[in-house]
């Protein structure tokens, strides 16, 4: 099994070391937070991070919004000490699971990029008219086919599912 530590509140109260205190005290192996928190903490004195033992960390992660390259590097360099894979994930509540993310120790990491679709996910980038974009062209993200965590019915009441979500 695994122990989960759930953190409540803001990362800067009562001190800007709050995250790092929790990691040190509980010997956290995987730490997952939002880029907004990272950007906020990166503005503070580096001692807030440096004064704590974070060597228990094996993987650090980012979730909730795109992470910019500057925040990615600060998180990787000062929290992960350039030794922990930084898993930048993309998903939405509606998708039911992470859809695009690197595989720690396998995928080459790219600052500010969630990298590759996970197994069973077929993303497409399309224009407004739903034609597939050319490489390097901006567009909207679509998922081509149903994915493993997609809700496709309500157990024992498919009509309710259709009426609630599609009609």
Locations of regions flagged by a protein language model:
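Gly/Ser/Thr-rich phosphate-binding loop
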Residues: 2-3, 20, 28-33, 42-109, ...
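ATP-dependent adenylate-forming carboxylate-activation enzymes
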Residues: 4-22
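Hydrophobic alpha-helical scaffolding
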Residues: 9-13, 26-31, 61-65, 112-113, ...
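Nucleotide phosphate-binding site architecture
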Residues: 12, 38-39, 151, 162
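Short, P/G- and charge-enriched loop/turn segments at secondary-structure junctions
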Residues: 106-113, 164
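Conserved ATP/PPi-binding loop(s) of AMP-dependent carboxylate-activating enzymes
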Residues: 116-120, 131-166
């Amino acid at each position: 099994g695994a122990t989960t530590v759930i953190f409540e509140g803001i990362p800067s109260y009562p001190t800007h070391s709050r995250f790092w205190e929790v990691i040190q005290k509980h010997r956290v192996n995987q730490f997952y937070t939002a880029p907004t928190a990272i950007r906020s903490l990166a503005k503070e004195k580096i001692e807030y991070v440096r004064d704590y033992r974070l060597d228990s960390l094996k993987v650090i992660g980012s979730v909730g919004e795109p992470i910019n390259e500057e925040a990615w590097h600060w998180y990787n360099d000062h929290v992960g000490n350039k030794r922990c894979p930084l898993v930048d994930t993309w998903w939405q509540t509606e998708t039911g699971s992470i859809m695009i993310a690197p595989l720690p120790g396998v995928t080459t990491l790219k600052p500010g990029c969630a990298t590759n679709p996970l197994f069973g996910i077929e993303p497409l980038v399309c224009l407004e008219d739903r034609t597939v974009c050319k490489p390097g062209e901006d567009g909207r993200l679509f998922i081509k086919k149903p994915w493993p965590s997609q809700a496709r019915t309500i157990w024992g009441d498919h009509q309710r599912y259709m009426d609630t979500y599609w009609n």
